[in-house]
Amino acid sequence: MATPGSEPQAFAPALSVTALHPHLHQHHQHHQHHQHHGGTGGTGFNLPLNRGLERALEEAANSGGLNLSARKLKEFPRTTAPGHDLSDTVRADLSKNRLVEVPMELCQFVSLEILNLYHNCIRVIPEAIVNLQMLTHLNLSRNQLSALPACLCGLPLKVLIASNNKLGSLPEEIGQLKQLMELDVSCNEITALPQQIGQLKSLRELNVRRNYLKVLPPELVDLPLVKFDFSCNKVLVIPVCFREMKQLQVLLLENNPLQSPPAQICTKGKVHIFKYLSIQACQIKTSDSLYLPTIERPHLHQHVEDSKKDSDSGVGSDNGDKRLSATEPSDEDTVSLNAPMSNIVEEDQTIKEDACHRLTPTKGEFQPKPSILGDSGISGQEREQLAGRADARHSGLMNYIKDQAEDCEELLRIEEDAHWHMEELLNSSKDRELDIAMIEQLREAELLQDPNGLSADIIERSILNLFPMDSGEASEFPDPSLNGQLQLETSPDREVQNDLMLQSNGSQYSPNEIRENSPSVSPTANITAPFGLKPRSGSWCPEEVQGSLQAESSPRRPQLLSRHVFLRPQRNLESIDPQFTIRRKMEQMREEKELVEQLRESIEMRLKVTLHEDLGAALMDGVVLCHLANHVRPRSVASIHVPSPAVPKLSMAKCRRNVENFLEACRKLGVPEEKLCLPHHILEEKGLVKVGTTVQALLDVTVTKALFT
């Protein structure tokens, strides 16, 4: 018995037979049954058979297995010997012959279960093959079939082998083969698998090796495949859904230009491939959740008036979940965050600590009063009135603290918003030179002042000198350097406090002198304009609370006022270099940009190539730099790891090897050690300036040597 899917083997020998059934002879010949002429069965006459062929037919009649393999037959042999019927044949092997079509005689063997037509010249399969309703194994490999007929899909096949043909596609009716367990269509010209292949619910083994497939249909996931071979095709991506093929044990995928999973994963086997696909699936499912807003992130683009209405500082709140903000930030807010979350949280904590410091002594004043009054014999009604006053004072203090916390929160938001606007101004510096000059002056004024001796008179003078304009114009130029450092209210009480602060610090300028410097603008307008805030006419501080606060902190007047204007923590100013300015930073960035462009021009001019727009990514693998070293001096880098079509991206180990070889070549060529960059400057794409210095030194050294030789 022939083994399906492998090279055909001869059937077991059977008894001899001398003739076929007469009705088979009548189907193809219109001659008399009693004629006897010499020759083979291909002349149209009943010619005598050779002894070996007679023996094979005789064995088939008795055993049910017909073996006519490797006999150079061009058609099925015919004989007129009566009394022998081959219609009960179960197995037929006609492999390694010269048949050009499936013999019609075989289509009459209704009991046929296994048919092997391997290695013939078959181009046509007759529709009469549908008569073989017992056929379960069919081998049509190594023939010249250009298509499988639809009638073939009406058979109860379990094994179908059609490899090494010229098939361009599979019929859509292939989904009718419900009992098919093995399908081999390897070494053909198939460009796509039909969607109906997902209906083969019994398929265990699928071989589409050496075809022209570019896409694997996701319907394959529905199949209970144990072995899947799609090697030597043009597949670029393995669908993520393939991770659900739980019964798959053997996966063959070599010689494909796979991009996902990458070749490094594919070479490790099925387990790593499926793990990669699972990770990809998780990333796809959670891609939307990565942009979900978190309640801890502050608003950046919310209008100031809106934030005043619904912001919650967290002080006196019953629900801790409502801290920092009453509404969840939008996606735009989370994307445009510029400040680290740790700074925001620390600043909020500082605000709460300040509020607690103010609240604690005030509560201490109110709490002893009921006990003292109770001891002096005051009536219950008077006691309730006094308690009501105490509650009113306490609630007023809470509202005042809450208002101040809201103002601080607004400053934090506006500061980040102003920082974002400043970056936009810097990016469009050519069109807004006036704005940038003003920003630089403000930043210098902030950073060059003494961190430990920060006082309000310096701030007021710098603001009044730098903003000699009305509040409408000043609001158009938000400056982040002042945010979080001062916010002076327009109420009469606050103006009195400002005057006191200027006098207590020993300032040489009185409020009147300051107003003379800018007669058209009030100090309040100048101060609030940089923040873009409108004066709050309704903000007030209770007299009792204000008096208690002044009495408690009169020795520490500057510190109290600094809390009122919500200065940023001193740690930020202490960590800033006083010699640093925005102007110097911009000059440094301009120089670095020129060095990077010079690096690009040097490489492109030497190697006659056009580098990618992202220069860091183009140099990261070290290939271009090694070629540059070899261009300067041939064979200075002995071996270079280069990407291939199968592996378009080098591993990090190979990239590091290339970079180290380049740096070693630079040392040998005479580049000074202090001008050599480090490997991570190239590998991490974070030191293009240092890489440019190294490349320029390499070119200069070679030019110098060329002049002296």
From Swiss-Prot:
SUPFAM superfamilies: Calponin-homology domain, CH-domain, L domain-like
Gene Ontology, cellular component aspect: cytoplasm
Signal peptide stretch: none
Disrupted gene: phenotype observed: No visible phenotype. Mice are viable, fertile and have normal CD4(+) T-cell populations in lymph nodes and spleen. In an experimental autoimmune encephalomyelitis (EAE) disease model, the symptoms, such as paralysis, are more severe.
Chain positions found as Phosphothreonine: T581
Descriptive protein name: Leucine-rich repeat and calponin homology domain-containing protein 1
Residues carrying Phosphoserine: S395, S518, S522
UniProt biased composition (Basic residues): 24-37
Keywords carried by this UniProt record: Cytoplasm, Leucine-rich repeat, Phosphoprotein, Repeat
Role: Acts as a negative regulator of GTPase CDC42 by sequestering CDC42-guanine exchange factor DOCK8. Probably by preventing CDC42 activation, negatively regulates CD4(+) T-cell migration in response to chemokine stimulation.
Matches recorded under Pfam families: CH, LRR_8
UniProt domain Calponin-homology (CH): residue ranges: 589-702
CDD domains: CH_LRCH2
Assembly behavior: Interacts (via LRR repeats) with unphosphorylated DOCK8 (via DHR-2 domain); the interaction prevents the association between DOCK8 and CDC42.
Gene3D superfamilies: Calponin-like domain (1.10.418.10), Ribonuclease Inhibitor (3.80.10.10)
Subcellular compartments: Cytoplasm
GO terms under biological process: cellular response to chemokine; negative regulation of GTPase activity; negative regulation of T cell migration
Main location: cytoplasm
InterPro entries reported for this sequence: CH_dom, CH_dom_sf, Leu-rich_rpt, Leu-rich_rpt_typical-subtyp, LRR_dom_sf, LRR_domain-containing
Region (Disordered): 24-49, 301-390, 504-526
